[in-house]
């Protein structure tokens, strides 16, 4: 005993361990919800489940869905008990609630430790940021411009893509392999810069900065989350994402100031212009509140769009039976509509179906519609959620549910095209369409507003690649296995593909 009392390190360790166990016990009971538990039970069991959550998350959600698909269940995670809502009526009940009841931003903020890594998604500072509806309107404005044949926006978008593709994908005749994810990530970044920052697309150092930032956010966010609140500012100081964020804020703020100096009555040409004008028209917001929102949009646009692009290319490379029908559709679309334009891209319905099936078969997140209860909430069936509870819907399991998607365990690249033909409801099965049975882009109040721009980017990239090149995995091997982390599924970031130029095909596909 004398040794213990004379050793401050041992005393400190005992106090820390006792404090941790006490906090864990409080968290265990405070976040408890009266629904079935999936995984280990009890205080000790839930603690073990929390430790193993990184590896067991997707399996737990699948198991819980199979046993409780008509109600709900809870799983033990580092955030406490998280509740998965499987019942369709209950999902409809919570998905459209206002943020003062169920907040999507609070989940994003905590997941990525946005206070330090992604200020444009910081829940604690939401009152200072340009509101979400304004952000959605700016993206809708871009969507309308893309659909307007008289607006040069989409033609310039295509030119940006063609330049970026030529710079990043330098294909040799022998089809030498190259890493798929980093190359296509830079192409997606160039397109995103074009839409959000216009002329800055021509600055390679900005593309470098954005790609580095997009990679740093999840890594640093997950790392910072491991530490208690008192240590997070110190840990964040040594992380990369906060410094990269500051650099981006400086670059974009200086660009806005330069544009203002050149022309105070500038007509908006990109999302940054639109947001800057919104700040002018709405006193009480500073320009930085718009800039950090734009930066947050970059992150959402680059990383997730690249992932689906890579998933799609890997599926095409290992499913040669789809190559001819997709190429025939692309060729017909280009001839009919006179080249690479919005009308041609929209007419590629089989390609759209293939991309959507690649997304279904490789769901980014096993969960969707993630919300945090910002106050105590009670469903109409009586289920009570204490303030702070995280809830989500079972996105991944639903996508393989045979009652929703017959032969769901099998890849069918024309699945959604055939459903559109059979039902004569093509809109219901497009890549961008969200529904209660397809939650890849969310649903309800917080359906992803950037999905239309993402769809344009992915379809353009995949169509161009397939039209001009034969695609194969390195050494003609099998499809590289996906990687999972907690609820998330990533394509193999190191996967290499081979592109071999096709023989001249005499069409309008320049």
UniProtKB/Swiss-Prot annotation:
**CDD domains registered for this protein in UniProt:** CYP503A1-like
Report the EC number(s), separated by commas if there are several. 1.-.-.-
Task: Report a single Gene Ontology molecular function.
Answer: oxidoreductase activity, acting on paired donors, with incorporation or reduction of molecular oxygen
The UniProt keyword set, sorted, is: Glycoprotein, Heme, Iron, Membrane, Metal-binding, Monooxygenase, Oxidoreductase, Transmembrane, Transmembrane helix
What metabolic or biological pathway is this protein involved in?
Secondary metabolite biosynthesis
Q: Where are the transmembrane segments?
A: 9-26
Named cofactor requirement(s):
heme
Tell me how this protein sits in the membrane: Single-pass membrane protein
Superkingdom in the source lineage: Eukaryota
Describe its function.
Cytochrome P450 monooxygenase; part of the gene cluster that mediates the biosynthesis of the indole diterpenes penitrems. The geranylgeranyl diphosphate (GGPP) synthase penG catalyzes the first step in penitrem biosynthesis via conversion of farnesyl pyrophosphate and isopentyl pyrophosphate into geranylgeranyl pyrophosphate (GGPP). Condensation of indole-3-glycerol phosphate with GGPP by the prenyl transferase penC then forms 3-geranylgeranylindole (3-GGI).
Q: What is this protein called?
A: Cytochrome P450 monooxygenase penQ
Species annotation:
Penicillium crustosum (Blue mold fungus)
Classification from the root reads: Eukaryota, Fungi, Dikarya, Ascomycota, Pezizomycotina
């Amino acid at each position: 005993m004398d040794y213990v009392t004379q050793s401050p390190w041992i005393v400190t360790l005992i106090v820390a361990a006792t404090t941790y166990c006490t906090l864990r016990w409080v968290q265990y009971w405070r976040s408890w919800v009266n629904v079935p538990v999936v995984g280990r039970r009890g205080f000790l069991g839930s603690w073990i489940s929390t430790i193993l959550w990184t590896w067991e998350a997707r399996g737990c959600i699948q198991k819980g869905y199979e046993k409780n698909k008509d109600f709900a269940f809870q799983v033990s995670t580092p955030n406490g008990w998280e509740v998965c809502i499987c019942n369709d009526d209950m999902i409809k009940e919570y998905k459209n609630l206002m943020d003062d009841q169920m907040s999507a931003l609070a989940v994003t903020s905590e997941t990525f430790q946005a206070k330090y890594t992604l200020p444009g998604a910081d829940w604690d500072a939401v009152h200072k940021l340009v509101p979400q509806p304004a952000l959605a309107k700016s993206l809708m404005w871009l969507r309308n411009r893309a659909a307007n044949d008289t607006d040069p926006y989409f033609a310039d978008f295509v030119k940006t893509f063609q330049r970026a593709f030529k710079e990043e994908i330098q294909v040799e005749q022998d089809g030498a392999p190259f890493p798929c994810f980093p190359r296509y990530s830079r192409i997606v970044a160039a397109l995103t810069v074009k839409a959000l920052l216009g002329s800055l697309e021509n600055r390679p150092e900005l593309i470098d900065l954005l790609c580095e930032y997009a990679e740093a956010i999840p890594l640093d966010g997950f790392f910072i989350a491991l530490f208690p609140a008192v240590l997070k500012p110190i840990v964040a100081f040594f992380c990369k994402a906060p410094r990269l964020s500051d650099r981006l804020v400086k670059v974009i703020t200086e660009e806005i100031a330069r544009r203002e100096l050149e022309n105070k009555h500038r007509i908006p040409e990109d999302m940054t212009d639109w947001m800057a004008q919104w700040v002018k028209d709405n006193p009480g917001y500073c320009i930085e509140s718009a800039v950090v929102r734009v930066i947050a949009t970059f992150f959402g646009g680059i990383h997730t769009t690249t992932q689906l692009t890579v998933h799609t290319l890997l599926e095409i490379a290992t499913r040669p039976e789809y190559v001819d029908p997709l190429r025939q559709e692309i060729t017909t679309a280009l001839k009919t509509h006179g080249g690479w334009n919005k009308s041609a891209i929209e007419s590629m319905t089989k390609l759209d179906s293939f991309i959507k099936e690649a997304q279904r078969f490789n769901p980014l997140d096993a969960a969707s519609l993630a919300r945090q209860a910002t106050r105590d909430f009670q469903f109409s069936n009586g289920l009570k959620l204490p303030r702070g509870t995280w809830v989500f819907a079972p996105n991944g399991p639903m996508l393989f549910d045979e009652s929703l998607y017959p032969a769901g365990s099998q890849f069918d690249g024309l699945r959604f095209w055939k459903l559109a033909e059979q039902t004569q409801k093509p809109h219901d099965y497009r890549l961008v369409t969200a529904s209660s049975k397809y939650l890849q882009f969310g649903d309800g109040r917080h359906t992803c507003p950037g999905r239309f721009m993402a769809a344009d980017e992915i379809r353009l990239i995949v169509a161009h690649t397939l039209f001009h090149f034969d695609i194969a995995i390195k050494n003609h091997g099998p499809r590289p296995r996906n990687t999972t982390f907690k609820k998330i599924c990533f394509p193999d970031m190191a996967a290499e593909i081979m592109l071999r130029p096709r023989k001249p095909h005499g069409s309008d596909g320049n």
